[in-house]
């Protein structure tokens, strides 16, 4: 609605009204809560990614725990250091729970979040199913590949490896009819 007001005021040449409408829109957006979850398999670096987004480092008291073995046992929220309305959610990784993926999705209340899919080493069927769930909910998702330094340390050309990772992710998504182009 605000966009139409801005467009109309702009077409009418009413600059003060354009500015007023833009300011009002910014106020609304800055107060709108945004819940983002890092979703993926255990050990993919979701907690570390949250710390990086918050610029807190992984050893700070306010940081999610990071350990070699299943550090995240239950849902935890962390506020963004840059945007007060953004909450980053650290959930137990898929594969860490003893329940089915369907039960996991219900227990973790996936309908509450926007998604960042976190993967490393391989793009698993759990990632594909999480992406399918997000798409079925009408939500967009992003895929972040972590621990890339380890993947690129094999000596092959980085550009080739990055392209292979991208193609593998797209191929797996398209097999399950997720994000068809």
From Swiss-Prot:
GO CC term, one of those recorded: lysosomal membrane
Designated name of the protein: Immunity-related GTPase family M protein
EC number(s) recorded for this UniProt protein: 3.6.5.-
Localization per Swiss-Prot or TrEMBL: Golgi apparatus membrane; Cell membrane; Cytoplasmic vesicle, Phagosome membrane; Cytoplasmic vesicle, Autophagosome membrane
Superkingdom, natural source: Eukaryota
UniProt function note: Immunity-related GTPase that plays important roles in innate immunity and inflammatory response. Acts as a dynamin-like protein that binds to intracellular membranes and promotes remodeling and trafficking of those membranes. Required for clearance of acute protozoan and bacterial infections by interacting with autophagy and lysosome regulatory proteins, thereby promoting the fusion of phagosomes with lysosomes for efficient degradation of cargo including microbes. Regulates selective autophagy, including xenophagy and mitophagy, both directly and indirectly. (Microbial infection) Following infection by hepatitis C virus (HCV), promotes HCV-triggered membrane remodeling, leading to autophagy and Golgi fragmentation, a step required for HCV replication.
Reaction(s) the record says it catalyses: GTP + H2O = GDP + phosphate + H(+)
Miscellaneous comment: There is a huge difference in terms of sequence and regulation of expression compared to the mouse ortholog and hence, the function might be slightly different.
Pfam families, sorted: IIGP
Stimuli inducing this protein: Not up-regulated by IFNG/IFN-gamma.
Any one GO BP annotation for this protein: negative regulation of type II interferon production
Gene3D superfamilies cross-referenced by the UniProt entry: P-loop containing nucleotide triphosphate hydrolases (3.40.50.300)
Subunit structure: Interacts with ULK1; promoting the coassembly of ULK1 and BECN1. Interacts with BECN1; enhancing BECN1-interacting partners and influencing the composition of the BECN1 complex. Interacts with ATG16L1. Interacts with NOD2; promoting IRGM 'Lys-63'-linked polyubiquitination, which is required for interactions with the core autophagy factors. Interacts with STX17; promoting STX17 recruitment to autophagosomes. Interacts with ATG8 proteins (GABARAP, GABARAPL1, GABARAPL2, MAP1LC3A, MAP1LC3B and MAP1LC3C); promoting STX17 recruitment to autophagosomes.
PANTHER family assigned: IMMUNITY-RELATED GTPASE FAMILY M PROTEIN, INTERFERON-INDUCIBLE GTPASE
Key word GTP-binding present: yes
Organism annotation: Homo sapiens
Disease with which this protein is associated in UniProt: Inflammatory bowel disease 19: A chronic, relapsing inflammation of the gastrointestinal tract with a complex etiology. It is subdivided into Crohn disease and ulcerative colitis phenotypes. Crohn disease may affect any part of the gastrointestinal tract from the mouth to the anus, but most frequently it involves the terminal ileum and colon. Bowel inflammation is transmural and discontinuous; it may contain granulomas or be associated with intestinal or perianal fistulas.
Residues binding GTP, per UniProt: 41-48, 66-70, 147-149
Main localization, broad class: Golgi
Record PTM: Ubiquitinated via 'Lys-63'-linked polyubiquitination in a NOD2-dependent process. 'Lys-63'-linked polyubiquitination is required for interactions with the core autophagy factors.
Domain remarks in the Swiss-Prot or TrEMBL record: The G5 motif of the IRG-type G domain is missing because the IRGM protein is truncated in anthropoids.
Domain IRG-type G: residue ranges: 32-181
GO MF annotation list: BH3 domain binding; CARD domain binding; cardiolipin binding; G protein activity; GTP binding; GTPase activity; protein kinase binding; protein serine/threonine kinase activator activity
Tissues where the protein occurs: Widely expressed (at protein level). Expressed in several tissues including colon, small bowel and peripheral blood leukocytes.
Keyword match Manganese: no
Family: Belongs to the TRAFAC class dynamin-like GTPase superfamily. IRG family.
């Amino acid at each position: 609605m605000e966009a139409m007001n801005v467009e109309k005021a702009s077409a009418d040449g009413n600059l003060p009204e354009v500015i007023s409408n833009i300011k009002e829109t910014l106020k609304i957006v800055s107060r709108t809560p945004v819940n983002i979850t890092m979703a993926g398999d255990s050990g993919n670096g979701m907690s570390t990614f949250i710390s990086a987004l918050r610029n807190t480092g992984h050893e700070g008291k306010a940081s999610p725990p990071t350990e070699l073995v299943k550090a995240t046992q239950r849902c935890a929220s962390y506020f963004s250091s840059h945007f007060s309305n953004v909450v980053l959610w650290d959930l137990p990784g898929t594969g860490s729970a003893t329940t089915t993926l369907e039960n996991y999705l219900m227990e973790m209340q996936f309908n509450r979040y926007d998604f960042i899919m976190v993967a490393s080493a391989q793009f698993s069927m759990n990632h594909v199913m999480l992406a399918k769930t997000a798409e079925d909910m009408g939500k967009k998702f992003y895929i972040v590949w972590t621990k890339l330094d380890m993947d690129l340390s094999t000596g092959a050309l980085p550009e080739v490896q990055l392209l292979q990772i991208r193609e593998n992710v797209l191929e797996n998504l398209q097999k399950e009819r997720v994000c068809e182009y």
